[in-house]
Structures are given as structure tokens and as C-alpha cells.
Amino acid sequence: MKYLFLIIMLFTTSCASLRSVEGFDTLRLKAGNFNLAAWARITKPGKPLRIYVEGDGMAWIDRRTPSADPTPGNDTVLNLAQSDSYPNVVYLARPCQYLPSDTCRPYYWTSGRFAPEIIAAEQDAVNQLMQKYNAPSAELVGYSGGGAVAALL
């Protein structure tokens, strides 16, 4: 029984940890009612940021079935951020990707992916990043649904 407890504890601990990305700092942002994951490579604090906004991720299993977790299945946007030579690059996940929140439910990565509270959370995250790195401005690069989020911000 104590081994079962240990296995469960190891599993839940690993689910809550974010992977490391070479050359990037791992960030957890509390934005609105959501937890957002971000990775940042900042070499010139006080200068503008370039923020890559993740797409819709794994929103659907098939045409009719929403996934239980919208975390992207591939690293396309993260790879774009990693290959960018700009001095201050941030990869910003969408709400409910990588990190759970009590408010996460399929609505937020399906029909509600551009709901006011989602856009407000992304705006809050961008503001936090700009403040943290003393950035006078931020350039948003959105991929797929992240492009719509960037445009709405």
C-alpha cells in the first residue's frame, strides 16, 4: 500500500512540473483565473519582447470529441521561439495548456477559446512579462489560434 501511495505521489508531482527548455527560463504565471506556462530567453532586459503565442494545441481528439488536455502534441511554436535570434524571446502557452487550473474545462479550448476571460488572461500574462523584464513594448507572434489571440490583444 505504501508503494502505491509513493507511485501516486510521483505521478501527480511530475504532472505539475513543467519541462525545461534549453536556454529558456521556465515561468508559471497566474493570469485571471488561469495558470499559464511560459518560457523566456531574455538577454537584454529593458528592451522590447517578442512573444510567441501558442495555437489551439490538442483541442480535439476527433471532429466531435474535445480532448481532456489541450497541451500541444508537437513543439512547432516552441521550436520557432527557440530558433529566433531576437534578444528577448518568450513562448506563451494558452490557458489550460501544460498547467491545470480549477477553472479549466473543454469549453475554454473549444468554442470558448477566444472568450473574454481567456483574452483577459493572455493580456494579463503579457503585462506581467513586460513588467518582469521592464520591457517598453512587446511584439506578438501568433500561431494558428494564437494568431487570433494576438490580434485580439
Give the positions of each predicted feature.
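Alpha/beta-hydrolase active-site loop
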Residues: 105-132
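Sec-dependent N-terminal signal peptides
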Residues: 3-12
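Gly/Ala-rich beta-loop-alpha elbow adjacent to hydrolase catalytic centers
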Residues: 140-146, 150
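A short loop-to-beta-strand scaffold at the N-terminal edge of the catalytic core in hydrolase folds
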Residues: 31-41
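Short, surface-exposed "cap/lid" segments of acyl-processing enzymes
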Residues: 43-93, 98-99
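Aromatic pocket-lining residues of Rossmann-like dinucleotide-binding sites
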Residues: 153
